[in-house]
C-alpha cells in the first residue's frame, strides 16, 4: 500500500469516527431532553392536589353506596401514588443509565414505555379527580333536582284530587302509587342528608321515572273511563231500544244471536273495568276498541234492515206494475206472431219463445203475490226479501230484454219484406236501363262475360220476385235471394262501366294511332291486331291493352292522358 493510500484511509477512518461521535452526542442530547420532559410531567402529576381532594371528601363522612364508591377511588389513588410513581422513577433512572452508556436504542425504548405509563397515570388521575368532584357535588345536585321533582309530584297530586271522579275504578291504584312516590321522596331525603348522595340519586331517578309514568297514566285514564262508563253503555242502550222497536214493528234478522251479543257486551264492560282498576290501560283501550267495533257491527245490521225495508216497499209497489206491463207486451207479441203467421213462414222458435216467457211471467206473478200477501206479517228479514225481489227484478229485466229482441225481429220481418220489394223493382228497372245503355253504345258485339252476368242478375231478380209473390213468404229465403241479387247487380254495373270504358278508349287510341301508322310498322301491326280483337272477339280490354302498349313506346304517357280525359267526361248510367 502506498503512502498516499494510507493517508486517505486514515483520513476516512478519522471522518467516520468524528461522524460517529457527532451522532452519539446528538442521540444522547435528544434522549436527555425527552427524559427531562418526562421528569417534569411526573412531577406535575405528583404535585396535583389529589390528597387534599381525597381528604375533603373523606371529611363528608359518606355512607352506603357513596362510601363504597369513595373507597374504590381512594384505593386507586393510593396505588398510583405508592406504586406507579415509584415504577416511573425507577424506569427514568434506568433510562438515564442506558443513555450515559451510549445504549441509545434501549434508552429510546425505555423512554417510550415511560411516556405510555405517564399517559395512563394522567388518565387515571383525571378519572379519580372527576369522581371525587362528583361525590362532593352530588348532595347539592340532588337538592336541586328534588325541588323540580317535588313540583311535578305536587301538581300531579293536585290534579288527581281535583278531578277524582274522572278516574273511576283507577282512582284507588293511582292514589296508592302516589303514596309510593311519597315514600320514595322520604327515602331520598334520608339518604341524601345522612351521607349517601349516590344512592339518593338512584332513588331520585326512580322517583322521577315513576312520576312521569303516573302522569302519563293520569292523562290517559279519563278518556278511557268516559268511553267505558258512559259512551259505550249509552250506545248499547240506544241499540237495545232500537232493536226492541224493530222487533215490535215485525222486523226479522238473519242473525239469531243479537240478544246474546248484547249480553256479551255488558259482560265485556264489566271485565274491562278491572283493566282500568289495575291500570292496564293498553288492554283497556284495546277492549274498548273491540266493543266499539261490535256495537258498530250491530248498528250496521239494524240500518241494513231499515234500508232494506224501504227498498222492499218500493219493489213491492213497482214490481206488480212492471210485471203487468211485461204481460201486456207478451200479449202484443203473441198477436204480432199470429198476424205475421198469416203472411210469413215464421220459425217455430218465435212462438215457443213467447210461450216460454208467458210461463215464466206466470211463475213470477205467483212469487210476487206470495211476498205481497205476507207483508202484513212478514216472516223473513227485509234484507233477504230485498235480495230475492232484486233477483226477481233482474230476471224480469232479462225477460224484458228478450221481449224487445223478439219484437225487433218481428218488426224487422215486415221491414225486410218492404225493402226486398223495393229492391226487386229497382233491380228490374236497372236491368232495362243497363240494356238500353249498352245498346246506345253501338258496340260491334256484347262480350260473353257481360251476357252471363246480365242473365244471372235477371234470373236472380226474377227468383226474388217469385219468393215475394208466395202465399206464405219465407223471409229468410227472401233475404238470402236478395243478397245474391244485390251482389249480381253490383257486379253487372261494374262490368258495364268497364266494357264501355275500354271500348271507348280503344276507339280513341285507334284513331290517334293514325298519326304513326304510315311510318311505324309496329304501330300498324298493333292497330290491325287491336282492331281484329275489337270487331271479332269483342274483348275490348285486350284490344285496349294491345294498342296502348304500342303507343306508349312511341309516345310515353299518352294512355294516361286519354284515360284521365275519359274519366272526367264519362257518361253515367241513369237509373
Swiss-Prot record:
Extracellular side: 1-8
Cytoplasmic side: 28-575
Lyase listed as a keyword: no
Alphabetical UniProt keywords: Cell cycle, Cell division, Cell membrane, Coiled coil, Membrane, Septation, Transmembrane, Transmembrane helix
Residues annotated as signal peptide: none
Coiled-coil stretches noted in the UniProt entry, renumbered to this chain: 110-191, 265-301, 354-416, 456-526
A single GO cellular-component term on record: plasma membrane
Lineage top rank: taxon: Bacteria
Keyword Cell division part of the UniProt annotation: yes
Compartments, record wording: Cell membrane
Segments traversing the membrane: 9-27
Family: Belongs to the EzrA family.
Function: Negative regulator of FtsZ ring formation; modulates the frequency and position of FtsZ ring formation. Inhibits FtsZ ring formation at polar sites. Interacts either with FtsZ or with one of its binding partners to promote depolymerization.
Entries under NCBIfam families matching the protein: PRK04778.1-4
Protein name stated in the entry: Septation ring formation regulator EzrA
Name of the encoding gene: ezrA
Amino acid at each position: 500500500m502506498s503512502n498516499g493510500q494510507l493517508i486517505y484511509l486514515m483520513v476516512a477512518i478519522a471522518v467516520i469516527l468524528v461522524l460517529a461521535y457527532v451522532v452519539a452526542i446528538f442521540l444522547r442530547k435528544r434522549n436527555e431532553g425527552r427524559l427531562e420532559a418526562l421528569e417534569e410531567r411526573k412531577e406535575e402529576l405528583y404535585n396535583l392536589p389529589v390528597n387534599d381532594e381525597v381528604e375533603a371528601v373523606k371529611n363528608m363522612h359518606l355512607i352506603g353506596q357513596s362510601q363504597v364508591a369513595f373507597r374504590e377511588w381512594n384505593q386507586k389513588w393510593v396505588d398510583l401514588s405508592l406504586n406507579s410513581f415509584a415504577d416511573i422513577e425507577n424506569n427514568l433512572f434506568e433510562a438515564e443509565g442506558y443513555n450515559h452508556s451510549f445504549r441509545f436504542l434501549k434508552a429510546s425504548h425505555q423512554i417510550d414505555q415511560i411516556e405510555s405509563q405517564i399517559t395512563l397515570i394522567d388518565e387515571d388521575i383525571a378519572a379519580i379527580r372527576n369522581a371525587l368532584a362528583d361525590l362532593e357535588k352530588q348532595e347539592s345536585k340532588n337538592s336541586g333536582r328534588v325541588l323540580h321533582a317535588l313540583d311535578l309530584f305536587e301538581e300531579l297530586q293536585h290534579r288527581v284530587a281535583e278531578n277524582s271522579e274522572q278516574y273511576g275504578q283507577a282512582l284507588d291504584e293511582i292514589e296508592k302509587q302516589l303514596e309510593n312516590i311519597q315514600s320514595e321522596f322520604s327515602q331520598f331525603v334520608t339518604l341524601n342528608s345522612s351521607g349517601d348522595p349516590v344512592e339518593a340519586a338512584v332513588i331520585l331517578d326512580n322517583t322521577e321515572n315513576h312520576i312521569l309514568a303516573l302522569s302519563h297514566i293520569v292523562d290517559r285514564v279519563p278518556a278511557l273511563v268516559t268511553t267505558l262508563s258512559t259512551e259505550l253503555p249509552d250506545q248499547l242502550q240506544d241499540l237495545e231500544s232500537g232493536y226492541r222497536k224493530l222487533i215490535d214493528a215485525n222486523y226479522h234478522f238473519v242473525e239469531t244471536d243479537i240478544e246474546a251479543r248484547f249480553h256479551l257486551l255488558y259482560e265485556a264492560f264489566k271485565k274491562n273495568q278491572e283493566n282500568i282498576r289495575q291500570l292496564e290501560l293498553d288492554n283497556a283501550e284495546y277492549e274498548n276498541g273491540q266493543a266499539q267495533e261490535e256495537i258498530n257491527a250491530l248498528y250496521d245490521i239494524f240500518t241494513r234492515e231499515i234500508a232494506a225495508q224501504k227498498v222492499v216497499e218500493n219493489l213491492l209497489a213497482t214490481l206488480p206494475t212492471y210485471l203487468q206491463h211485461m204481460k201486456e207486451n207478451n200479449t202484443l207479441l203473441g198477436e204480432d206472431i199470429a198476424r205475421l203467421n198469416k203472411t210469413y213462414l215464421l220459425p217455430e222458435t218465435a212462438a215457443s219463445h213467447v210461450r216460454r216467457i208467458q210461463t215464466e211471467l206466470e211463475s213470477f206473478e205467483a212469487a210476487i203475490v206470495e211476498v205481497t200477501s205476507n207483508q202484513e206479517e212478514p216472516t223473513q228479514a227485509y234484507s233477504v226479501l230485498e235480495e230475492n225481489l232484486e233477483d226477481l227484478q233482474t230476471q224480469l229485466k232479462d225477460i224484458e230484454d228478450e221481449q224487445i229482441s223478439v219484437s225487433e225481429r218481428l218488426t224487422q220481418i215486415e221491414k225486410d219484406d218492404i225493402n226486398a220489394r223495393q229492391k226487386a223493382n229497382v233491380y228490374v228497372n236497372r236491368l232495362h236501363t243497363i240494356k238500353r245503355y249498352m245498346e246506345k253504345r253501338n258496340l260491334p258485339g256484347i262480350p260473353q262475360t257481360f251476357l252471363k252476368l246480365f242473365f244471372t242478375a235477371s234470373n236472380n231478380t226474377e227468383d226474388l220476385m217469385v219468393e215475394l209473390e208466395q202465399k206464405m213468404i219465407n223471409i229468410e229465403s227472401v233475404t238470402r235471394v236478395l243478397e245474391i241479387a244485390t251482389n249480381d247487380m253490383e257486379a253487372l254495373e261494374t262490368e258495364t262501366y268497364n266494357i264501355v270504358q275500354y271500348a271507348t278508349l280503344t276507339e280513341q287510341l285507334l284513331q290517334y294511332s293514325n298519326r304513326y301508322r304510315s311510318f311505324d310498322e309496329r304501330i300498324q301491326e298493333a292497330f290491325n291486331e287491336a282492331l281484329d280483337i275489337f270487331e271479332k272477339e269483342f274483348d275490348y280490354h285486350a284490344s285496349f291493352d294491345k294498342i296502348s302498349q304500342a303507343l306508349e313506346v312511341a309516345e310515353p304517357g299518352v294512355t294516361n292522358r286519354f284515360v284521365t280525359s275519359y274519366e272526367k267526361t264519362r257518361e253515367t248510367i241513369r237509373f
